[in-house]
Amino acid sequence: MWRAIWLRISEKGLRRPPPPSLRTVTTSCTTMGADGVHTVNTTERLAKLRELMKQHSVQAFVVPSEDQHSSEYLANCDKRRAFISGFDGSAGCAIITTDKAYLFTDGRYFLQAEKQLDKNWKLMKQGLPDVPTWQDFLYKNLGPHTQIGIDATLLAASDAESLTKQLTPKYSKLVSLKENLVDVVWGEDRPSRPQNSVFHLDVKYSGQSHLDKIATLREEMKKKKAEAIVVTMLDEVAWLLNLRGSDIEYNPVFFAYAVVTMDEVILFIDSAQLDDTARHNLEHVYTMPYEAIFEHLNSLSRTLELDRDSKVLIGDRASLAVADAIGKDNYTIVRSPIADLKAIKNKTELEGFRQSHIRDGAALVRYFAWLEEQLNHGTVINESQGADKLEAFRSELDLFRGLSFDTISGTGPNGAIIHYKPDPNDCAIIKKDQVYLCDSGGQFLDGTTDVTRTWHFGTPTDEEKRAFTRVLQGHIAIDTAVFPNGTTGYVIDAFARRALWQDGLDYRHGTGHGVGHFLNVHEGPHGIGVRIALNNTPLKAGMTVSNEPGYYADGKFGIRIESIVLVREVKTPNNFGDKGYLGFENVTMCPIHKNLVDVSLLNEQEKKWLDEYHAETWDKVSPLLKGDTRALEWLRRECSPL
């Protein structure tokens, strides 16, 4: 999983620190079996945790994935759920009772969790029939009068409010503990919080000054009659102030809060982290120590002299601790206006996406051409070595600052593990007679990339070709979709699945996620998928989103085709309802493997799309490959017409 090439983000790039060793092996609920080579033995950790629970008079303890900023990706010091359970996927929640331990996660991680959890854990496969969410489990499955221990800095205030309402009729309640019990069990071995350098992102990349962004935010605050907004999400702080850091692996963010009023902006950060570029460009922004945030929030309502009609805004992922510090009657939970502003990229950011993806395409072509040559020569290459080589090619690109996530390099059955991460000490050899799935991305000063391509360097089976072609048809259906303004990703998700459904196939993940601009590779609030929450955010011109349908045959192979698309306005012959219509612009430039295509399944429009996509890829990427005969000839072959 963890590879030897480390990078550091500052003006010099992103560094990957050595991680803790957590690499460890369906019905809707699965009790894990005996410990295996990939399993962390959690017996002692759970025993210590339960003893602490007893001392604090709680009968259950909740260990969410997120940190106190509700981050999806975490610094090593915040990987509490991974420490206590052994499961290190990016999504999930652990609930420990006096005699049982439950791990809740979604379909992306079922196979991974089954491999990593030991016999102490029961896997709860969220999304399958009769499996509750972890929130529902607390009030539906636990008995009455249950004291449920939580860390208020890790639980969203919105979740706490709804849970409290549900638990009250059963005389159960959430108990905010002064210390995180998992941290106590972890003890001195728990890593310290990173405090890496923070730098200014020049306006030639961001396209808008931080002062303009703050002015726009204040206009949104006026609409909501707010005197202040507390910014808790790390990517929102970074975007608002045009700052970038490296406190969390793969994500150019840093630990900080911000409080914006009509008169001032305060950044709560360890000031020693700010380099000269950051200090010189933080005009009209005050700084205070990171740890001072809660004390400041305690006094905020008095300082602002809030009345019945004026409130402090907090986002819907802000923690219960933040809400409690402000005071019960002084805040309003809203969907973060910064999330909506950040989601729509400006012209500079959109052009950065185009250019960074073209450069990224050159690295991908070099890698796949190299890999095919090595396999044809009989060279033994394992999944981790392949990922390392791809990273090496990317590291040569202009404006590269590191990976945007850990490369998923999976051959054969490992490709069916949706978020598989190869362990250099225990991973498979890439074989010519197996399907190979590679999902990877980079962080660049002018954009963030995320691309998946699936290959077969030998002779694929009819089953593999048919499945790949159905996935391709879904990919094309999204790419060519035209829809009226006001349409959500929830509505168009079925376009990606239609061809798979014809064969009785499907996949257990969303079709698309938003992508940050030199920020987190997963960004909301929009996306394409079946989660009902995605029906709350219409797709708008300027948004970026992935297009990644897939199919996974457990124990055999995995297929995914992923490109990044920009939402754009399109001209249509008519304009019913004067709504205006939208479509997509594909910016990912990497061939789609024709060796896996069953051409007989494609209609003429789909064939035309594939040929035109390959012609565009050749035109844009080939100029970057001058002098690399191997890559050029490979690209020429892969981009030739059907």
From Swiss-Prot:
| Signal peptide residues on this chain, from the entry's feature table | none
Top enzyme class, one word, equals hydrolase
GO terms for biological process?
proteolysis
Q: Name one Pfam family in it.
A: Peptidase_M24_C
Entry GO CC: cytoplasm
Q: Which InterPro entries match?
A: Creatin/AminoP/Spt16_N, Creatinase/aminopeptidase-like, Creatinase_N, Pept_M24, Pept_M24B, Peptidase_M24_C, X-Pro_aminopeptidase_P
* UniProt-listed CDD domains: APP
UniProt-listed Enzyme Commission number(s): 3.4.11.9
Q: Which domain of life is it from?
A: Eukaryota
GO MF, one annotated term: metal ion binding
Give the record's cofactor note, including how many are bound.
Answer: Binds 2 manganese ions per subunit.
Query: Which reaction is this enzyme known to catalyze?
Result: Release of any N-terminal amino acid, including proline, that is linked to proline, even from a dipeptide or tripeptide
- Cofactor(s) needed by this chain: Mn(2+)
Q: Which SUPFAM superfamilies match?
A: Creatinase/aminopeptidase, Creatinase/prolidase N-terminal domain
- Please list the residues that bind Mn(2+) 2: 439, 450, 562
Q: What residues bind Mn(2+) 1, as annotated?
A: 450, 548, 562
The record's section on PANTHER family has: XAA-PRO AMINOPEPTIDASE 1
Protein family? Belongs to the peptidase M24B family.
What's the protein here called? Probable Xaa-Pro aminopeptidase P
Query: What is the gene name?
Result: AMPP
